[in-house]
Amino acid sequence: MRLAAAALLLTAQAAWGPREALKRHEAEHDAAHAKEAAGDVAHLAEAVETRRGTVAAIKKTGVDMYGDKKAIDAVKDLQAATRRYLFAKYGQADSYTLDLQIKFPESMGGDRDIVTIETAPVALMPHAVHVFLDAAITRKGETWRCAFHRNAGHVLQAFLRAPGARGLAFQEYDAQFPHERLTLGFAGRPGGPEFYISTVDNVRNHGPGSQGSKTEADSCFAKVVSGADVVERMRKQPAPKGLGFVNNKADYIVVEDVQLRPPA
């Protein structure tokens, strides 16, 4: 293989000159590497999808996902496969940092600002992190939409609509990453990709044993690391008391884009 590559390089040098031949050789090598990497990501995605289906099927039976051995084993298998996929797709990192580009409605000034979030450690919450990155980053396109449409007393809730995006297969949760103030959780159960920012400590409201469940919790998948002042301003979004759903779409706080920072 090496002899063949060397012969090809020498032939190219004769035709284009050493510098041009080297550049072409490097480009072909990079293209081959990119194709191989894409193939690896696709293979890992298939592995995640298979395991996700298994976990979702178990979840539908109504068993305790934190107490049933079959469920625990299936979840561990899904989490391991998801970590491998995340590292191949988004880069090796303990967690990922993203910038949410916020646009306030005209009723709040119409200006823009940024809220920066850091995901939960991949070691703890790979499935939840994957669901968010898939919807917020991978599936962005012309019909992608995200906006905060609920201002309740304890959360700011946003819809996240991306073609093909799905929610959680189960409520992944780890007590080491609880629903403290300025964390992000998935709305609904299993929940997602719609999410909320906790504006108060919501461990009791959304943690284990909440909302009628003896053991389960909302998934908590990220925290605000910059822009707490922006979040505080968002709490002034016009909304009726009670459930806090914004009646006038013109008063939505729009997330115009989400940018994933390169892993450090």
State each model region's role.
Residues 2-17:
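Cleavable N-terminal signal peptides of Sec/SRP-targeted secreted and luminal proteins
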